Amino acid sequence: MATLQQQKIRIRLQAFDRRLLDTSCEKIVDTANRTNATAIGPIPLPTKRKIYCVLRSPHVDKDSREHFETRTHRRIIDIYQPSSKTIDALMKLDLPSGVDIEVKL
């Protein structure tokens, strides 16, 4: 039995600001739906927390420390049956600079 391989675009988004990430996901899904492609997502992935421990004093006091953290929020969007219109619309889409985008065909 031969099965047809479905064409798929996987878009992976990362950002430090969750609200900025969600608005970017909405723009991508709306663009895909306008060009008659099927968009599944955004699928939230686990948030990565990176904690930095810094001494508060420039001197010897090792008891006084301060913690800082960065949170990286991630989402995945799958677009099935993309046409050339879909790819052109996604290329022309204006997204904020705080969002890291990775596209796989």
Curated annotation (Swiss-Prot):
PROSITE patterns: RIBOSOMAL_S10. One of its GO terms (biological process) is translation. One of its GO terms (molecular function) is structural constituent of ribosome. InterPro entries: Ribosomal_uS10, Ribosomal_uS10_CS, Ribosomal_uS10_dom, Ribosomal_uS10_dom_sf. One of its GO terms (cellular component) is ribonucleoprotein complex. The keyword Disulfide bond does not apply. Belongs to the universal ribosomal protein uS10 family. HAMAP family: Ribosomal_uS10 (MF_00508). PANTHER family: 30S RIBOSOMAL PROTEIN S10 FAMILY MEMBER. This is Small ribosomal subunit protein uS10.
